[in-house]
């Protein structure tokens, strides 16, 4: 850049992020009626609009190309940064009641009403543990009926290696070309339309919905343009105020196992969390849930179902699945697979493909196509086993207490009889990492003792850069650079393990992989867990090595 020349795109991005931070932290903006009565605020926004119209702070990204990389760059600009997330947490305001109203408005601006999404014949899935796996199972079952349902959409989060994984058709991520095409169709429609600031004070000219909301809009647009006959939607967080809850008439809803997670948004108790999850229930759409839910949570789910004038049915593990090798490993997946069977059954019966619904009984007879769908389900990063050279990698992106216990138990059972060296590769940057490590340790001990334990950041490359699809602004960059979390984890591990394992800290996933390759000449079993960011980054590192 020439000396003295201003970097307008960076200035603009900085201005917009700071403006957003002001809005998020200002009480008046959470209450539109207060905004209407404040002349100073109204004048400020009129002036801001004037600046936008002069192209001084107009979105700079509309002037760049429209490749897949451009789309990813534009999408990453919509992430909330760490400071904003912390500010929202500190306010203690868990209910942004404008969220769904804004989703309806964003939809209008790209040419849709919520009723347009009804044609997608949606399965809507929430829960704390296993909702992504259940969504994948359901999609795979429906995919066995290609003659009647030639295109099945699947919307899940987060992604592992590529953001395209979030929007799938017939189980495969949409192509880079289609992602870019549909992305910029949505982006440009938002640029060419405006909203009433009286009704939507957050939606200033040139602004966009946040990262997840934008992807939700993009998924609807993609699935409609691709003429999908049925779609499976996984909730992002919670349910009641999740952006996917713009879905007005799902065919069926599912709730996987409940647990404590995302407490700053959903509440600190299982009752509060269940209330949020039950927010996806709709009149006329039957709801199903797994057995052995926490009793307090199940009570709330039943109350929510009654309130929404629908039914809630507990699904037992089907005996017919006991000897079936599911496409996603782990004994606990039998419950998710059973739930998926009931969800798919509702869709297929409603579509006049199945004459009779499958009975919700442990002794029910499950059609062969359902079994094939469950066996063929592919879902990377969940109880995944990879052989790389002399080593065997056991990979699971567990990041909650319950999922960590399940994943650690799976690893313990898989390697209990193995005589190989045992290595743990762990990362968790934003949750209570030490508590997760304690859950892991208690689940594998005393049967499994690790020889080496490596704590890494979620940075992909040793150059300090991330794979473009894995850029995350949701963690403290200072903590990442100073390895604060990793050093804390080392102290905690040495304490609970009585200094038996050798502990290591790496600044990137690539360095962690290189370290593992040099630790031993003999084979090793490596357990990779703690976050999906770690799992995704490691798979990207593997891909680069395979290409070489």
UniProtKB/Swiss-Prot annotation:
EC number: 6.3.2.17
Bilayer-spanning residue ranges: none
Reaction it catalyzes: (6S)-5,6,7,8-tetrahydrofolyl-(gamma-L-Glu)(n) + L-glutamate + ATP = (6S)-5,6,7,8-tetrahydrofolyl-(gamma-L-Glu)(n+1) + ADP + phosphate + H(+)
Residues holding Mg(2+) 1: 157, 234
Co-factor requirement: a monovalent cation
Gene3D superfamilies recorded: Mur ligase, C-terminal domain (3.90.190.20), Mur-like, catalytic domain (3.40.1190.10)
Record-stated family: Belongs to the folylpolyglutamate synthase family.
Function: Catalyzes conversion of folates to polyglutamate derivatives allowing concentration of folate compounds in the cell and the intracellular retention of these cofactors, which are important substrates for most of the folate-dependent enzymes that are involved in one-carbon transfer reactions involved in purine, pyrimidine and amino acid synthesis. Required for methionine synthesis and maintenance of intact mitochondrial DNA. Involved in telomere maintenance.
Protein name listed in UniProt: Folylpolyglutamate synthase
